[in-house]
Amino acid sequence: MKFLIFVLCLSLVNGYGIRRSIQEYDPKESHEHPTMTWELLEKFVGSTLYITTNQILSLPLGAEIYCDEIEGFPCSWPGYKAYAYNHIDYHFDLSSPFYSFVDKFYISLGDREEKIHLRVVGATPKDKRLTVGCRTSFSVNLPIGTQIYHDKDMQHLVEGRHLECAHRVYFVKYCPSHSHGYCFKDKLKVYDLKRVKSRKCFEKINQQQKSEL
């Protein structure tokens, strides 16, 4: 009898511990921080909100963040979403390379046609990400999965991610999962800084690169 009571008590304690553990890690558990209300969102309808740094944008249930189609391809917001009991936390991590290629989003207000525009301005600009100055050979700092080609027809793939430091143009193809089939195609410009002595010299090299394209 004592053994049965002990087992029963132990089961109750373990059950409480498991239930407590689930409550502590339940993403829908109530937590408090500034959250945009529907009344506040109404004030920004038709306007543009700017995202300038890593941050969490908390929206009431029913309001969601989307990005516009990219040349007919659907586009989904690339960040992490945390669901709470009365709102959704949208985590903006501006180190994501996706924001270098797509910087315009919008907040959908349920079934309404009106929307609130969002513009990410704190991420690394695409031109800066695709322009490299070097003094020695280097590894390319581009998103995982980006393909680099020697030619504009994208037939001759560069092996690996290590490039020689020389004035030249490569061609890149970036196909993020959030663009659902669409691939960004652009140019990666490399400049050997040991040979750039002045702005005039830089402009001459730049002109030569354009003529080669």
UniProtKB/Swiss-Prot annotation:
Pfam family membership, one: Corona_6B_7B
Keywords noted in UniProt: Signal
Domain of life: Viruses
Leader sequence segment: 1-15
Protein name according to UniProt: Non-structural protein 7b
Species of origin: Canine coronavirus (strain K378) (CCoV)
Lineage: Viruses, Riboviria, Orthornavirae, Pisuviricota, Pisoniviricetes
